Curated annotation (Swiss-Prot):
InterPro entries: DNA/RNA_pol_sf, RT_dom
PROSITE patterns: RT_POL
One Gene Ontology cellular component: mitochondrion
One of the Pfam families matching this protein, by short name: RVT_1
Annotated compartments: Mitochondrion
Keyword annotations from UniProtKB, A to Z: Mitochondrion
Cystine pairings recorded for this chain: none
Domain Reverse transcriptase residues, every copy: 91-318
Protein name: Reverse transcriptase-like protein
First-listed, main subcellular location of the protein, grouped into a coarse class: mitochondrion
Organism for this UniProt entry: Chlamydomonas reinhardtii
Keyword Mitochondrion among UniProt keywords: yes
Amino acid sequence: MFTVNYILDLFHTINATEVQHTLMHKRPASLHEVLRLAGLLQGYKDFLSLTKQAEAFFQAGDYRSAFNTISKMWVHPQIVPALLLMECFETRELTVPYWYKSIKLRRQYIQKKNGGVRPIIVAHKGLRICMAVINRLLQSCCVSWSNQTFGFRPGFGTHHAVLHLAQKAQQMLNKQQQAVLVTFDLQAAYNSVDIKHLMQTLQLQYLPNDMKKLIWMWQHLPLAQLNAGINGLAQGYAYSPTLFAWYVDQLVGQHMDFTIYADNFAGVFLTQQDAQFAVKEAQTLLQKSGLLIAPSSIKMHLLDKNQHSELNWLGHKVLFPSCTVKLQHHQLLVNQHSPQVWTIQKWDKMLRTLGWVQLALNADWRRF
């Protein structure tokens, strides 16, 4: 015979189980769960393993072997689909990949803080996730960059660059009473890039042929408003910042004592004459590629142990002579139209409805 307490305990047990089950169904799905659901988890694991191999080759300066490893990732039946799903997971939007069909791009102009505008190429969402996959494959090259080249990967943001510059200034002021800090930017940096020279410098001829063809094809897509092509390296493509930073590192970062973030340069020198000479030497190295230093951007900052001053660089501030860094914290904007919770049930429904996995696994887009 069931007692009242037994019935109550049983009710609470069932209720607690249902609540736990409900919470599991309501919580956001993890990346691993989504990849497992799509049958692409092994592809992701293989990507991580092969990326380590590629990084080791890049660090050793063996570009041919590094690109051969990237080729293995490219032709792997699951790696590219897994990376596509990763991009969708991060944006919480299941987008059908759109590799290279004939489309026209849009150009938007973003206001710069220092005046002027920056032309940004806006690609179709389906094309953007494909470009992002190319970027993930290329980013194994970052380990070969100078430790003075920053940007576009974890652990090398603007604040890391400013901290690095402040440390160099501190080291210089520890040795002597004064120093000179010089900053400058490149003129129309992305638009001035010679794509052929970039590909030769970075030895991209060793990339898989289809990857090269895609990059070259995307580079020559027409702009809808102007019915014209893209000048230089397209701003707005996911892989462009990686290629540009790598290119500048090869041209200058590996040879000179500058802290570099994208097209922003800063260095600390003993005297103004040394600083001026360094700027001229940097321009000589850059001229081989057609890139130019913007003359109006060259600024000399005198640092003195007995004088207080400050430098604003990359949105952050350095106080002298203490070399203290005050970081600017940017508030992240949340897209109000994005769902806050994507459960595994939601992912399952979307993947099935679109037939997304079958579309992503279709390797026809690799064949030209």
